[in-house]
Amino acid sequence: VLLLDTTNLSAAAFAATAVAALGALAFRRAAGLSAGLAVPFTLVLALVAMGVNVRGEAVRVMYPKNRLAWNKPVLRSLWNSHAHILAFLPEVGPAFYWGGGDGAAQFTNTQAFVVVDGEAGTPMTEWDGNAASLDWVSYDVTTLPYHLRKGGRVGIVGVGGGRDILAAIWSGSPAITAVEIN
């Protein structure tokens, strides 16, 4: 975790490779065997790759969990004790609907996507602070509870990029309690 706090996954992987190469070299020497060129070559290659990658993402994790992560420009790449979080650069485009339906009105907004471990993606939508500018959320299936009961108190588990908070604000909820675990 210390390496992930100070570098990125690729640099940490290269560092682990370098440590493994040193360990292999030590075991070979302890057994009285020649190290040959393979271990020093691996060590040098890992250290060079780590040095190139330590502050940027020259070598980026593109396939976490054996699937292509979004190949877009990254604003931030962060780690915590159990997840890799990518925040992509904001883009202007069609409003994001989890389920807008065929008759959903088309709105445009600025949004950035956040992806956790290459799996769980969520939009972060730019908002001007005016509840009237949130009408676009009313066309999403996730706002069905608010159509049935506007103005109720709201509890949200898994805030993500805040999309559910925007829906609660749109509905006029007087109190919103939100919890994010990751």
Feature annotation, model-predicted:
Residues 1-182:
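Alpha-helical transmembrane segments of multi-pass membrane proteins
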